[in-house]
Amino acid sequence: VRLRTRTERTDMHHANHHYGHSHILARYCGMPEPAHPPRIHGYLQHGWNIGDGLAPGTPYVTGSRLLVWSAETRRRSWSQGRRNVIVVGAPFAYLVEMTPAGDEPGEGTIFYPFHGWEGQQVHGDHQRLIDEVRATETGPVTACLYWNEYRMGAVRRLYERAGFRVICHGYRGFWWRDHDRDFLVKQLAELRRHRRVVSNRLCSAIWYGLLAGREAAVYGDPMVLDNADMTFGGEPRLHRQWADLYGRETDFATCHRLARAQLGADELAGPEELRKLLGWSKKGYV
């Protein structure tokens, strides 16, 4: 096992490892040790957002390259005065390219409740959401809780008592520790296992489900996030700008087209080009 050097551990932004993103890109690029990705030269957008690609409050070295998922995010980033912004596409989109789908249409629904994290918690009525999902969805329901809520026994038991299959894709990692490099691998497998993906907020999982060829819908109480940053419009803007995804039934073709744009699925780089964009040499470690 090759241990990371101090330079590799400290010089790359820790968020580049979130959800196994760096590992997926290393695999796509054909790097010699994808389990130990080289240092990405820049900050890689680690989740879908309606801002400039950076999570609010993210420590960021001015002038560093910002590697974003879509042309739309790049335009917003430029509008905020950022430069050196490069569209690379979402790591999940590269994973889909590397993982051929079967012919199975999937069964039932996978539900992603809005979640909190180490720095912010969510307030809302999970039982109310459960009742709405049960009244709307047909077939078996899987509730996929984020690690934050999965560790809350009281919340997890609500979904278990409702008869839902309750799962968690793993821990996204934090400060270079405990990254589940197969997080998105497990998520893609679960999305393809189901016919529909739903959530009470528009989020990465909805876009991922659509890219994986699944129907998607956003409905229910969006809940409230502690000290939510409303700089870019928050939940009201989500509903206003992407109204096509809201409601119990949506048009797949329209929503799938939107998902491809948000994830940069039509702008993915080839392995050699992506290596150059990430600052990787073919040999692997620089």
Regions found by a protein language model. Give the residues of each.
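Short active-site oxyanion
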Residues: Y60-L66, P140-V141, R193-V197
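Active-site and donor-binding regions of nucleotide-sugar-utilizing enzymes
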Residues: V1-V96, I206
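Donor nucleotide-activated moiety binding/catalytic core segment of transferases
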Residues: R151-A216
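Conserved catalytic-core segment of nucleotide-activated headgroup transferases in glycan assembly
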Residues: Y94-E160
